[in-house]
Amino acid sequence: MPQKHILVVDDDQNILALIKTILSQKDFRVSTALNGEAAVSLLQKDKFDAIITDAMMPQMDGNALAQSVKNDPKLKDLPIIMVTASKEVDLVKKSFSSGCVLFLPKPFTAASLLSLLQLVLK
């Protein structure tokens, strides 16, 4: 089975490194971006199987990224997992209405991240 390619987007380099390590150990191919704009650029250059994105980032946040993906006919079916430390119900609702399929609250475990990713990749 070919390696699944995951795009991880977060403005915190420590979180990016953590998620990349978790996924790489499970044989995923991982690309990273520090903000939504960089993610959009990567999405235009390469093929991905899923996106894991932080909700709150400067410039283009996770919801704006999700909306951009869902408005692109070539990317609209790409599953998006939103990750955030925020517990605001409005943010969760906005994430789903933007096009995210799952929501992962921080802090999270490697097992919970991998379980959600497996769900969206089926």
Locations of the language-model features?
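C-terminal output helix
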Residues: 108-117
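A Lys-centered signature of the CheY-like receiver
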Residues: 104-106
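Charged docking surfaces used in two-component/phosphorelay signaling
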Residues: 17-25
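Receiver (REC) domain active-site loop signature in two-component systems and cognate sites
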Residues: 57
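Acidic, metal-coordinating helix/loop segments flanking the phosphotransfer/catalytic sites
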Residues: 32-50
